[in-house]
Amino acid sequence: MKLETERLYIVPCTEESIHVANEQGYNSGPHIVGHVENVKQDKDLLPWGAWYVIRKEDDIVLGDIGFKGKPNEEHTVEVGYGFIEKYWNKGYATEAVSELINWAFQTGEVEMIIAETLLENESSIRVLEKLHMKRMGTTETMINWKLEK
């Protein structure tokens, strides 16, 4: 399973891809390791967790994106993303998350995608705005977003 955009490959995180990312010095956080462990118990979880974003021109891992689990009863998933700082503000997050959102809506299992971002994270706010997500509300520290199919 692999998604592709003009500049990027987007691949689900697996034990093999973790090794490749780690060899490049990419810090695969606990959300990635935990997801790979969960997939060992339930292979259907694979696309509903972490995905690496890889630049086509040099096969470098730029960051990771993904969902925080399978769609719930309301056919909703939460999307999240994180990129190495030197790759910020180059459109990679918008390009990758847009492709992942399109994939999710095409599965027929998802009707709404939600996200949250820190109030002061202007780059992340711009990504969500470019993806046409709508602000649902705010807390003391976070803005909540949604995008309906």
List PLM regions with ranges.
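Conserved acetyl-CoA-binding loop-helix of GNAT-fold acetyltransferases
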Residues: 89-103, 125-130
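GNAT-family acyltransferases
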Residues: 1-78, 83-86, 99-103, 107, ...
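Conserved beta-strand-loop-alpha-helix junction that forms the acyl-donor binding cleft
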Residues: 115-125
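Short acidic/polar active-site loop segments enriched in Thr and Asp
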Residues: 111
